[in-house]
Amino acid sequence: MNSYNIYKKNNEATILYHAIARDEDQVMELAKEAGIDMDGLRIELERANVKDQLGKPLSARIEDALIY
């Protein structure tokens, strides 16, 4: 699994979503399932082969990256 940041194409300073997925196609699938419109957004690989504290691969997910 890999870690991805998702942000607007014209504003790379603000990450909108964070995803754990095997590839960008899975990020797109997760976004669709979550009702996230990816039009105008960019996916960027943050880190490859991410694992939890015990060294196990993380499960696929997408979450809001903004802190309110």
Which residues does each predicted region cover?
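Short aromatic-glycine-(Arg/Gly/Cys) micro-motifs in beta-strand/loop hairpins
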Residues: 1-14
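A short, exposed loop/beta-hairpin motif centered on an aromatic-Gly-Thr core
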Residues: 13-23
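Short, mixed-charge low-complexity intrinsically disordered segments
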Residues: 33-68
